[in-house]
Every structure is written in structure tokens, then in C-alpha cells.
């Protein structure tokens, strides 16, 4: 099971990335991927709905559809049994796996450790976390990526919920990690993420159809 260890593409701190989330069907994923330019700065995500529908095959299928060497994110949103989940995502071909910041600290610690073991990047998704710094302070090791995330339902049903752009500089001023921003549906929000020094901007269907 460890034959994947030497083949993984990893993120680099000096680069900025566009992260394209695919959440609908594999057919639609193929259509979107075919329109993307080949670039080491484009990350392609097997979204949570795809993984729930197709299992880990969603990851391997998206990897097959994308140009060789494309960085694939498995958005499994781990909340428990981190060792098992990371192994599954890595063996399916993912370059990164996600864990929720609201998960038990023990789970996040295990998740980060297992990602290191399988030579994939760890992404901790801070959706519904008031302060990412407070979570990071409790961890034994840092993840590769901290994701500030306003959820789809939050965006749709709450006009008051804002993406915490101010936390980007707080996190990067205290920790040597990459910061991703997810949940922006407009070009303006993507621009704000870049202006505030986000390393990764996550977009999904609503964004690139606008």
C-alpha cells in the first residue's frame, strides 16, 4: 500500500494556486476539466458529494480525466477514523486530503500524522470555526494548508456570514502554513482573497458560471 509514497506532487509555499472544486457528476467533472489549461498552479478537487456518490473511485476517475501530474484534492472532510480515511484517499491517488477543524483535536492530530506518512498534503477546513488560530494552537503538528471556508448553505441562507479574510494575515503571521479561501461566489471575493494574501483560492460551479 505504500507504493504511492514517492510519486506525490506537493504544494509549494512560494506559489499561488487556483483550486477548482467539482461537486456534481463525473460527466460534468470531465466537461469542466477539458476546459482547464494544463498548469501546476491549478488544483482539481473531488468534492464531498462526488466522493459520497462514487466513493474513492471519484478520485481515481478525476485523476484519469485530468492531465498527467495534476494535483488532486480529496475533499473527504474527515471527522473521525483519520488513519483509515487518509489511507483510502492516498491509495486512490489523492495529493491532498481534508479534515474539518471542528473534528476532535485527536482526530486532526492523527489526520496530519497520517498525511505525512502517506506523503500527501493535509488540509484542515475551518468551516464553522470561529478562530482558526485557536485550533492551530492545540495541534501537535501543523497541517500543510488551513482553509477558511464559508459553506454553501451559509452563503445561500445567511447574508451576515462573511468569509473571514482578516484571519489570513493572523494565521500567516503566526504559522508557516498555506492559507486557502473557499466559499466566494464572485470575482470580487476571489480578488479579496488574493489581495489579503491567500495562497489558494477555491472556486466551484457557481463561480465559473457567473
PLM region spans:
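Conserved N-terminal beta1-alpha1 strand-loop-helix module at the mouth
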Residues: 1-73, 78-83, 141
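Conserved anion-binding
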Residues: 12-14, 81-174
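Glycine-rich beta-to-alpha transition loops that act as phosphate-gripper elements at the mouths
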Residues: 22-26, 74-83, 125-130, 178-188
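Short secondary-structure boundary segments
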Residues: 48, 101, 126-127, 150-151, ...
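C-terminal helical cap(s) of enzyme catalytic domains, especially alpha/beta-barrels
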Residues: 1, 111, 194-195, 204-210
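Structural preference for beta-strand elements that scaffold enzyme active sites
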Residues: 15-19, 41-45, 71-73, 95-96, ...
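Glycine-rich, proline-tolerant flexible connector loops at the mouths of alpha/beta enzymes
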Residues: 42-58, 150-157, 205-210
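Well-formed, non-transmembrane alpha-helical positions, independent of function
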Residues: 35, 61, 88, 138, ...
Amino acid at each position: 500500500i505504500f507504493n504511492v509514497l514517492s510519486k506525490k506532487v506537493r504544494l509549494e509555499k512560494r506559489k499561488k494556486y487556483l483550486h477548482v472544486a467539482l461537486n456534481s457528476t463525473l460527466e460534468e467533472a470531465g466537461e469542466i476539466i477539458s476546459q482547464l489549461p494544463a498548469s501546476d498552479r491549478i488544483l482539481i478537487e473531488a468534492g464531498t458529494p462526488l466522493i459520497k456518490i462514487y466513493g474513492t473511485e471519484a478520485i481515481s476517475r478525476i485523476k484519469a480525466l485530468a492531465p498527467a501530474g495534476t494535483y488532486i484534492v480529496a475533499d473527504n472532510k474527515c471527522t473521525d477514523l483519520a488513519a483509515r480515511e487518509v489511507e483510502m484517499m492516498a491509495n486512490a491517488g489523492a495529493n491532498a486530503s481534508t479534515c474539518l477543524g471542528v473534528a476532535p483535536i485527536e482526530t486532526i492530530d492523527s489526520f496530519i500524522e497520517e498525511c505525512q506518512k502517506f506523503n500527501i498534503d493535509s488540509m484542515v477546513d475551518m468551516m464553522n470555526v470561529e478562530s482558526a488560530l485557536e485550533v492551530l494552537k492545540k495541534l501537535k503538528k501543523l497541517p500543510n494548508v488551513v482553509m477558511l471556508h464559508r459553506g454553501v448553505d451559509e452563503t445561500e441562507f445567511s447574508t451576515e456570514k462573511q468569509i473571514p479574510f482578516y484571519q489570513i494575515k493572523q494565521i500567516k503571521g503566526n504559522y508557516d502554513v498555506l492559507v486557502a479561501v473557499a466559499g466566494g461566489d464572485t470575482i470580487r471575493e476571489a480578488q479579496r482573497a488574493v489581495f489579503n494574501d491567500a495562497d489558494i483560492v477555491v472556486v466551484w460551479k457557481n463561480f465559473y458560471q457567473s
